[in-house]
Amino acid sequence: MTTIQILLMIGFYLGLFVAVVYFTRARMRRVMGALAGGAAFGLVGVSAVALGEAQGWWRVPQSGVAHFHVLLWLGFAISCAPDYLIVWRVVRRFGGWGLAVCVLVSTIIGPPRDYWIAASFPAWMTFASGIAPALADATVYALLVLVGYGVMRLVGGPAREDSLARSNGL
């Protein structure tokens, strides 16, 4: 990915984040928790990219550029934040089972999505053959939900104790 493409992705997900904040009726503490969860997963995501390249599971061509990792971290942080607000609402409604389903769905849907993107845009990322890259990618998606939601819960508190913004009928 080029710098411009990453910045466009960040802008798109920032707009999506604003929409998800509105529709989930999240209060400021929960919004800050989602951003903190995104920042925490950003560290995991950038580390996973580096580990996957070192193991030969995948290759991200721009990873040698100095500012690439910072932009990638910011991209992970912003693009994952809407997910945590959605997971928060699911957990608020369904409890631990809802969280388990979110982890499972993310783990199942994530790798095919990444493989499709890699096939469509090989200049952005390529995967090695075999089962190891797919399992590693699935693990990263499980961590996406667990790490990010865990940090959001530390910052924002338990989902069931949270009140909703705009609960006056709007």
Region spans (language model):
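Aromatic-rich, lipid-facing transmembrane alpha helices and their immediate juxtamembrane interface loops
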Residues: 1-170
